[in-house]
């Protein structure tokens, strides 16, 4: 029952996993449910999925976000063009999964090793990142405990969308091994996708018996792509899901990796997803799960900054590293749930509701974010027309 408490702490995963509870409980026994899943797996195996890869390329082009650069490009070469040199300079560590589309990867052991080595080197090169696993070494900001207590008293999570679904029994009826794979796939699909869309996609996979590594490995990639549509970057995610299933079968006997380094080596898995899966699936807390809400609020509160400067952190991963330097480890799990709810209801991305917030007196960003001049002008023009 590892997931019972853990999943309720991470509402995104809990919401995704809970979407399938009603249908999963309808089965009379677990063995009969497995037999039904096995019968529905009569899908034709297809080793050539290049067409799906082609489709993913065109989809990625329409994104206005910065693409991930292949880790292969990070390897030093003797000679390179001016364009290649510029691309190398623009590359800065591992992008967060929330902020960029999936990068194409061949999923081989060598490519995954290069990906992990690159992450480790970037971690060792940064003075702030070198103390990732050590809590409480940094100087905590003033009044941080008072701020957290004020947010808790506002109880933002009770009104937040992430808490709309009951989470206390999420996934607890599955055998541990199946539950862990279930968590991994659901989390992979959830990035850059609303919870209800992810939940529906996972449910469709379950209806077709495609929530085990064996089933996904045998299924056509096109079938997976159709079932998970319209999650964000569904074509690329279908490719990654197939690769992850193969790796779990070949290297982990159908289970999922249980260390941070091994999870980071999987296609489509960045620091945020790795820490989230590690905690929910294995009940192992090695880092803070930082999404866009936590990233935004920590910068507004002045809790994090770039190493040696007062500049805001530029990515959730930078925020995670900076936050872990001073936040006590006992708060690492709770901080995500608390700030996500706060960010969805009060400290919103655009025009935060400072008027209803109880910590404005100690918040350095209170009432400083106002509508832009252009938006005010549009409102003025609209009112004149009326």
Curated annotation (Swiss-Prot):
Enzyme Commission number(s): 3.2.2.-, 4.2.99.18
Extent of the signal sequence: none
This protein's GO CC annotations: chloroplast nucleoid; nucleus
Region (Disordered): 44-66
Chemical reaction(s) catalysed: 2'-deoxyribonucleotide-(2'-deoxyribose 5'-phosphate)-2'-deoxyribonucleotide-DNA = a 3'-end 2'-deoxyribonucleotide-(2,3-dehydro-2,3-deoxyribose 5'-phosphate)-DNA + a 5'-end 5'-phospho-2'-deoxyribonucleoside-DNA + H(+)
Chain sites annotated for binding [4Fe-4S] cluster: 347, 354, 357, 363
InterPro entries: DNA_glycosylase, Endonuclease-III-like_CS2, Endonuclease3_FeS-loop_motif, HhH-GPD_domain, HhH_base_excis_C, HhH_motif, NTH1
Main location group: plastid
Family the entry assigns: Belongs to the Nth/MutY family.
Name of the featured protein: Endonuclease III homolog 2, chloroplastic
Organism encoding this protein: Arabidopsis thaliana
Gene that encodes it: NTH2
